[in-house]
């Protein structure tokens, strides 16, 4: 491939001259479920590729068993998303669904408890028990969760904040919840920082 063609298809200013063709993996819901150990991140219409990539990377670090997202979430294979994952995109199972409420019903049938950080939450997130199978619902950066998806949650929780801040960045909220789950489960390994 000529340098000119390579520069044309690359999305960076100074490409490194490396090109790879990889097969996109296909996952089923069963690939994300691990009984009582199930720990899911469930995304509705997240739009920022950097946020999505950060959530995938942080999710791997926190030991999630998979990520579920609806079709209106930014493309998981957006170049900025891929770079933000720092390779985690190739190790964290994911599922993209046409109709998120139906999939959330399936999760309820599997006894997976769903939590949403929501303005209606009146109990701090660290007061909940995340030691069983669970999933965290994270919504769009500008609008949060839609009413339809928020109503699928078993519990609303809140994250304490000072000052006049009304909410946190979606990736930050997701990180707090995923790591609280990891902490409660006592999941530590030699790679802890």
Which sequence ranges carry the predicted segments?
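Short, charged, surface-exposed secondary-structure boundary motifs
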Residues: 9-10, 106, 125, 167-171
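Active-site/ligand-binding-proximal alpha/beta "capping" segment
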Residues: 115-164
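RNA substrate-binding interface of SAM-dependent RNA methyltransferases
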Residues: 4, 29-121
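Short secondary-structure transition/capping segments
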Residues: 31, 79-81, 126-129, 170
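Arg/Lys-rich RNA-binding interfaces used to dock onto structured RNA substrates
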Residues: 1-48, 116, 182, 190-193
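Short secondary-structure boundary/capping segments
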Residues: 9-12, 30-34, 86, 126-128, ...
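Structured adenosyl-cofactor binding patch, chiefly the S-adenosyl-L-methionine
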Residues: 17, 61-62, 76-89, 147-193
């Amino acid at each position: 491939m000529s340098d000119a063609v390579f520069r044309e298809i690359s999305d960076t200013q100074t490409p490194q001259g490396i090109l790879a063709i990889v097969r996109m993996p296909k996952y089923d819901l069963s690939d994300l479920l691990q009984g009582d150990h199930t720990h899911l991140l469930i995304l509705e219409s997240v739009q920022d590729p950097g946020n999505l990539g950060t959530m995938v990377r942080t999710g791997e670090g926190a030991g999630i068993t998979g990520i579920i997202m609806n079709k209106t979430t930014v493309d998981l294979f957006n170049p900025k998303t891929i770079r933000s994952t720092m390779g985690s995109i190739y190790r964290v199972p994911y599922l993209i669904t046409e109709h998120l409420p139906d999939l959330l019903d399936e999760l309820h049938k599997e006894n997976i408890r769903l939590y949403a950080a929501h303005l209606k939450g009146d109990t701090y997130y660290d007061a909940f028990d995340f030691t069983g199978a669970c999933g965290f619902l994270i919504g769009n950066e500008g609008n949060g969760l839609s009413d339809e998806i928020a109503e699928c949650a078993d519990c609303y929780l809140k994250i304490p904040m000072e000052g006049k801040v009304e909410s946190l960045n979606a990736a930050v909220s997701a990180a707090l919840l995923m790591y609280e789950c990891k902490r409660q489960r006592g999941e530590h390994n030699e790679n802890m920082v």
